[in-house]
């Protein structure tokens, strides 16, 4: 953990870096808005829904996201809250972008899980929780949409415990729901916070009633709801877990908050808990050793590359999570994979699509480095030491298409666009060794649409897809050079290079893949590859 002797101890200890995970439509983008609003980072929280209107959620900033009202790429937003400085990483809400989300989860120290209280635990939430469990990431839970009719709150907590295998500790408890929603009782503060709906960027003054037995409570919410609240709380406090910060930090227990993001209610209670309990920047495993956040020398790793954040400049930004030390404008860094010293004078910080030049940044912060094709996902930057941070994955795609040009003269731009998009992890590109085809591989169908729309808007290339006889791909490697050469000679027609020039086996059927593996037991066929 952080040592208080560190010169920049105060800066690092106030950092909280977290991501929001949820099922699509559970209200994640609205929560992102309102978190920024309560952090006073956005003066007007624009609604996401009005697809025809000009107000788009601050974090959904690419053209296609604006059209469809879904967040497809990860945005980074930094804002102060209380005594803390919060780095919020917004992850794609659409299931096709699980890879991008997965990689983002390697760059955070905690997560906020948003659940639609009318629906409960949904499929995407299950998958994302599996990912957070690999690193025992601490989870804070927000039960959203209390201004609608919801499921029984006790049932919701049981479902989280049974399906997601994490103990629940309620911090606030709802009083009614839908039209009858009156507010929440804050168990830790022994006070009732009454609901008055705030819309857009208005945060209403909260009326607070101290104590559960206060007669004012009965007057404010009605005798029936007050009696129901006292009865429920007796049950809840008897049956649920007390909050234990150690268990929370181990990813075994989640504090649960209730509210409505759309009505600007409950988000601040959750933020209070998150900033109070979530960890400041954590140590991180490199292949060589564990790196502590309190170390003075700079280290960081690239978890995402985003092309064309500024269409005027055709640029690419590499998102770097700082693990230790301080970034200062103009400092020299070692780009470990290339073994090259680089001078970084123009790193940027983010406020969801708005960029500012970073003069300094600390462990836990995310900075953006301008990338002219030399930086890849998974790259490590240090102040001299040779380190490689581990655990940033690439997945074998499950869907494939051949990509064709409407104008054959634009082959060069097409290849450039595809390689750049594959470097940022939006899609994977395979170039078969035996022909000039370009095969695009994705984890979900939406990725194909994104690629065609971005090729058109960013590279001025009109492309179309055709079906291709590919069922799956595996990266191949072998320690025995001679046997590998023989394997390559025999399987020439099934081999391709990906965007990073790694050799992959392209199988027309799963049966074909199984046969190839049986025939060449010494060759490793990998479904995931570390960046």
Swiss-Prot record:
tr-type G domain: which residues?
Answer: 13-282
Recorded hits in Pfam families, A to Z, give: EF-G_D2 (PF22042), GTP_EFTU (PF00009), RF3_C (PF16658)
List the InterPro entries. Answer: EF-G-like_DII (IPR053905), EFG_III/V (IPR035647), G_TR_CS (IPR031157), P-loop_NTPase (IPR027417), PrfC (IPR004548), RF3_C (IPR032090), RF3_dom_3_sf (IPR038467), RF3_GTP-bd (IPR041732)
**From the record, what ranges are coiled-coil?**
none
Q: Which UniProt keywords apply?
A: Cytoplasm, GTP-binding, Nucleotide-binding, Protein biosynthesis
Has the keyword Protein biosynthesis been applied to this entry? Answer: yes
Job description of the protein? Increases the formation of ribosomal termination complexes and stimulates activities of RF-1 and RF-2. It binds guanine nucleotides and has strong preference for UGA stop codons. It may interact directly with the ribosome. The stimulation of RF-1 and RF-2 is significantly reduced by GTP and GDP, but not by GMP.
Question: By its UniProt entry, which PANTHER family does this protein fall under?
Answer: PEPTIDE CHAIN RELEASE FACTOR RF3
| Protein name in UniProt | Peptide chain release factor 3
